[in-house]
């Protein structure tokens, strides 16, 4: 985005902050695909056999200047005999550039927000998936109740357009947004069918992600406003920067109607000890107070979704649990607060007495059953967790097979190094390693035992069987006790921006 900042500022000064003319700019499409348009080919779309080049974009912009061809119908698959591309292909390019244009005002606001709060240098660490777990360790041991919240979706698309009107003042651009909605989804339905949403998300993943993030951003902004109104203590907003599109920083600027509608209701109670965390479509709300206040927040969420977003949500979709008795699933971990009882004997002169001290500790558990199901679905093992070969990879070279298994194993190891008990993690590594050996044995048409004897001389899998302890030994001396504590304790990686698809976050 930085390399196109000059062009954006120039276009904004010429067009008085209108977004509609940006659709006719070539650099927007270069920005959409992350390449420079000076190259001959800047995108290769998996869904099509053709490649989109600078010449194609120029032809597309020329076609859009003609009013009769401004809208490219996505369902029209007739090929143009002169250009050789169907209209669906051009529609895909337009939708990618269209999303970039929509993201521009939010990106500029987000950048200025980062500069004002002076957290730019910590931006990469906050984007890490593991950045939220240190907060859990610091805060959750002092809290009592937790509520699982699954954000309802889909929302009617006209509601999204009305919300966008507060942020985008360009009327022609909003009309074009409605046209995209009309042709990609079932516009006449009050509730968008799940099949249409699925097709829409596959054909336009960036567009779908933008709409979902904007909907969540609006919902969380209202929640932040309610949270600030419910207590005299000001809430320091925690910016969630772990999503792919980071235009939705938490802001306190909301429409005045919210203050008018909710001020009377929220004056009945105060709840200063509350924390809210979200990743993708699931969020959790943790509080120190009694379940009565948690039930009040539950009621607010239900009414907010039904009245403001016209999304039906039932109360049983939000579960309230006690942290000391129940665990909850979040970001691929089972988490609960474990109570450790310690007895201390004290003696004063001739009198002695015993004191019981209860220590709370956050327990992070690897969901071994869920991971085995994911590995079985990906054909690394059966449903019982017994490793099997990967026939699809048998045609690859030995180096590519080992490299793929090694990447998955390291990714699992990094992500679940924050576990309190490493035994489940070792089992996952065992499944992947033995599956790799069986895949190589299948390729070379040999038994596992004969292939392992051959590997002893060639040392082909020496890197694959290297444990994290060897990596830590490069930093700390082996005689140091720090090495053993690091290897057995929890380790959070603040540079972990993504994980593999085998880890289920929902």
Curated annotation (Swiss-Prot):
Keywords in alphabetical order: Chloroplast, mRNA processing, Plastid, RNA-binding, tRNA processing
Primary residence: plastid
GO cellular component: chloroplast
One example GO MF annotation: RNA binding
InterPro entries: Domain_X (IPR024937), Maturase_MatK (IPR002866), Maturase_MatK_N (IPR024942)
Localization per record: Plastid, Chloroplast
Protein family (similarity comment): Belongs to the intron maturase 2 family. MatK subfamily.
Protein's job: Usually encoded in the trnK tRNA gene intron. Probably assists in splicing its own and other chloroplast group II introns.
Identification of the protein by name: Maturase K
Source species: Austrosteenisia blackii (Blood vine)
Lineage, highest ranks first: Eukaryota, Viridiplantae, Streptophyta, Embryophyta, Tracheophyta
Gene (name only): matK
